[in-house]
Amino acid sequence: MHQQTLWLFSGIALVLVIATLISETLRWRARARPSAVLDNLVARIRAWWVMAAVVGIAFVFGRAGVIVLFALVSLFALREFITLTPTRRGDYYALLAAFYIVLPWQYGLVWTGWYGMYTLLIPVYAFLVLPILATIGGDTTRYLERTAKVQWGLMICVFCISHVPALLNLQIPGYAGRNLLLIAFLVIVVQSSDVLQYIWGKLAGRHLIAPKLSPSKTVEGFIGGVLSASLLGMALWWITPFAPWHAFGLALVANLMGFFGGLVMSAIKRDRGIKDWGHMIEGHGGVLDRLDSVCFAAPVFFHLIRYGWA
């Protein structure tokens, strides 16, 4: 593992240690009056420890570990999406193809580095073939809606997420062997934006930005969180091939995409009448609840780097 990666993970561990000490101290001091907010905070920090450990182990195994990790993440995310969007028996062949053919094929293409195919397989070929498979059962009830749900699930949960490990395929002059740090940069910046938006919203939030979609998101939280996380991205320029201002700009774009991606996924949840996509991650909900912002940020981040630096 590259020395910069070790320094980065050491910093993450230090932040988590401090957060753990603070949260456990607050909960101990409030032990006479149990607080659901503090309990949730402790659960979230413990979940962050697990997630950081899993990512760290994947990084130890390098390219193979990272691709396998995100393939599994896509599998769990797609399962959550399909489980909470009604399907019928007529969707059997389309779902079979989505889970057992398209998903592994997409990550196989990322593994081989075949850019021309992993950027087209799902938005072109799967987009056309899945409706054909859905017609085999002869079920036309809500046909367009059902087909669109499977297509959307593949786009969000497989196509978009696969662009995170696809960062390993970029050939950036003077940056050979360090592409894992691009993944770390993207995930840290976007996930930090989510946390900082929440903190800024609690501290200064006054005006709701989209009350029907996400009652907890405020204009102040959005501005403060996105800008703070973008400044964090600029501070992390040393792990990237970018100049500080380039790092800020890329972080800003990623954070904006992440924010609006979160709103889109919230709209889908409201449409389905659910609060969380799942319960896999304690304190965070499901995989999609934790990665909804990354889903929208990853493809844009990937292509900006590919056309600007690779």
Tell me the role of every PLM-derived stretch.
Residues 171, 303-310:
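Juxtamembrane boundary at the C-terminal end of a transmembrane helix
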